[in-house]
Amino acid sequence: MRAHRIDTFLIRENIKLEIIHESNSYFGGEHISIAFRFKHLGSQHELFNYKEKLLTVDKAVEEKLEQQAKVQDDGEGTMENQTWSLKSLLGAFKRTGEPEESVDVDNMKMLNESKMLREKIQKQMYFHQPVTLISGYVQISGVFQYDSEVISESKFKQDEVKMVGLDIVPGHTTNSVLALEDGEHFKGKRNLTNYLNSDYTNVTNGLLFSESGSRGRTGTYNERTLMISNDTSIKTLPLLLIPQTLLFSEISLEPGEVRTFYFKSTKLPKDICPSYSSSKVASINYTLEVGADVLSDDNIEKFSNRVPITIAPYISSNAEQYTSRLDKPAIILKTGNIKELKPRLFTRKVSTASAVSFGRRKSSIIDIDSPLEDNEFVKRVKKNFIELVESNQNVSRDIDELIDLQMGVQFGKDEDSSDPEPNDSHFSNEMVTSAESSLRSDAVTKRRKSYSVRDNISNLEQKMWNDCSLVKSDENSNLLPQLINLQNAYQINRNNETMAKVSLSAPFYKTTDDINLVIELDPITTPLLKVTSLTVSLESFEIINPKYKTEGKGIGSKPKGNSVYEKHFICFDECKSVSVKLLPPRSPTNQITGQFKTDVFQHKWMIGLKFVIIAKTESITLDQFYEDKKGILFHSKENLEGEEFTCYVPIPILCTSEDFMGW
């Protein structure tokens, strides 16, 4: 398991490109930092061996030709010394006529074999030859796509805009293969595909993809196939553009050589709209494009590919988020900063366990200048330890968190800067190295580096335990609080009768959390009814602003949810409670989006509960098949039909402070 998400592509058969994402997701108000590693897959040793083989073949041919020429010269000299008579002339023809033809055939055969062997060696050596790359670049763009049959195009202040660099729908394409789980391949020119190391992927690009149909699976998210490209109802508005940034003008890769370039953008706007692709109506997609030209036999082969990047919303320390604006001109940032990372000559091997648990800290002994300061320091450390123990008696906290707090007092904060510049080679090299050497077992890992947004999210849970009020900090700001009037218990009524009680494990969740809940059925208040089955689903809803709705398209109607995860239960006999665990997807390129709000629509999460209710009788699941004086024979019912009752429970889900790694 790697510590970072890594996307891998082959520029050509012997050049591999690795895109190492500094974080996944990127937050509003922070930088986008990515390392690009160009690696020659050949070997200097193999190249030397093939050159030696070529020299051996050429030398063998030359020796054979020289030997044959010498034999011919000796034969001609012998004939000149003989007496010119009719008998000797006939003898000469008998001696030299047939052998010369045989020698020519042998020579041609030998030359052809040598030529074929030489071509074979050259083909094998081609893989290990140096390669020249020119004009390497990187570009980041973002678009908002929507279905104009639901969201009115005329309601936007700006019409659909075409911007150079944002040619996602009709423009730049790459050769790719998109495969489904059933093995069907779609080949040809495709937009925004070739996302991963493999052709097999369920990554989407919003409305460029449509649902491939219900497959009866649970836990799937955004499994879609490419739509017909001439769908005129899909409209696109540009949101973000970081123009092409030159990685290098020209580099030459020797066999086995690795060149790494570190890209860092300017800070993203805090009110940037997050990535969103779980809807059939609207999607927000951010993509990273990287390209280069390859010099090959006096020809230039172009390479370019795109990968999705995930952007999460900015969250303040009071769990506030900005209301993002989609109906505005696109944000154009400055080009990013580029620095080539040189490999270290001598590196110290760091224990995996220590690297995972803690960052590097300052020594507490070095900072002590006097015995008095030593005594004060020890008292402060002891006092902090006692306070942590006392605070843990009321509310149980994670042991790792307690250790971090104690070590923060004893050894100081991490030496790493929370906002490294592009010329910070220590951080950049550490990022690239840890991406290769990390052996962590989870698909999600806590970041060692400290960022303000991540700190804000990490501290929210502790604030909730301490009953801190998370109210709006500034009434005049565009920040909206996300955690208000929280509760983790709900009572479900039907016709003024209590059906069930729902208890959630937490008042709010993050996108990496398991959602645990218990549903307690109430047979006392509904003695004549029985719940025979229960379906629990995690669904995303988007509530479209009426101002932007197409006239006559579901104005006033209830929004429909998009199911992300679903569990089905059958309730036998006297079933009083059902325990449910909902598992949202958590892969590096397949993750859910936390709640957010824009000027066009608002995204929320709900837990859907569908009960199947039947009248309670003596034999609910049995039918009388036969009866005589000896008794009655029952058979179980093949079908059990009942009345459906559906309701929804709101659930706050925010983005996580943890990273989605790669493998």
UniProtKB/Swiss-Prot annotation:
GO biological process, any: retrograde transport, endosome to Golgi
Keyword DNA damage: no
GO molecular function, one term: guanyl-nucleotide exchange factor activity
Biased composition (Polar residues): 426-440
Entry annotated with the keyword Phosphoprotein: yes
Entry's Gene Ontology cellular component terms: cytosol; Golgi apparatus; Golgi membrane; guanyl-nucleotide exchange factor complex; Ric1-Rgp1 guanyl-nucleotide exchange factor complex
Entry's localization field: Golgi apparatus
Residues with the Phosphoserine modification: S351, S354, S357, S363, S364, S370
Superkingdom: Eukaryota
Pfam families: Rgp1
Predominant subcellular localization, coarse grouping: Golgi
Region described as Disordered: spans on this chain: 412-443
Subunit field text: Forms a complex with RIC1.
PANTHER family: REDUCED GROWTH PHENOTYPE 1 RGP1, YEAST -RELATED
Function in brief: The RIC1-RGP1 complex acts as a guanine nucleotide exchange factor (GEF), which activates YPT6 by exchanging bound GDP for free GTP. It is thereby required for efficient fusion of endosome-derived vesicles with the Golgi. The RIC1-RGP1 participates in the recycling of SNC1, presumably by mediating fusion of endosomal vesicles with the Golgi compartment.
Remaining remarks: Present with 589 molecules/cell in log phase SD medium.
Name by which UniProt lists this protein: Guanine nucleotide exchange factor subunit RGP1
Organism annotation: Saccharomyces cerevisiae (strain ATCC 204508 / S288c) (Baker's yeast)
